[in-house]
Structures are given as structure tokens and as C-alpha cells.
Amino acid sequence: MAPQTLLPVLVLCVLLLQAQGGYRDKKRMQKTQLSPEIKVCQQQPKLYLCKHLCESHRDCQANNICCSTYCGNVCMSIL
């Protein structure tokens, strides 16, 4: 392939990647967005809770809810 055609092909590839949503992984972007059922926690969690992350209320034990904090989504007691 001639050197003059390499640059247009490269530009075309970059433009196609941007049209598809860029370089970011769509699943990673979906995880960073809050689920409609997960709300911001009312209180600051204890530091040990940051080791036990959750994705939904089903991941938590009884009398606990999954809520969003500075360290991610954690299970916190509702009592």
C-alpha cells in the first residue's frame, strides 16, 4: 500500500471508531451510572463496608439496602 493511502485509511478508521461510541467499553460506562433502584446513601458508611460492594438490593442481606457512596455501591442497614 502506498504511503499516501495510509493516512486516509487511518483517519477513516478513527472516524468509524468515534461513530460507534469511541474507545470506551459500553459495559463499563453502564456500571458507572446509577441503577434506578440505587440511591445515594443517607449516612456515610463505615470503612469496612467499602470492601463489600453490591450492584442491586438483591446482593444485600435482609434489612439492608444497596446505596451509592464515595467508595462505590455498598449494603447499608435500614434499621
UniProtKB/Swiss-Prot annotation:
It is found in: Secreted. GO terms for molecular function: serine-type endopeptidase inhibitor activity. Residues 34-79 form the WAP domain. Disulfide bonds join 41-67, 50-71, 54-66, 60-75. InterPro entries: Elafin-like_sf (IPR036645), WAP_dom (IPR008197). GO terms for cellular component: extracellular space. Keywords: Disulfide bond, Protease inhibitor, Secreted, Serine protease inhibitor, Signal. Pfam families: WAP. One of its GO terms (biological process) is innate immune response. Residues 1-21 form the signal peptide. The keyword Signal applies. This is WAP four-disulfide core domain protein 10A. It comes from Homo sapiens. The gene is WFDC10A.
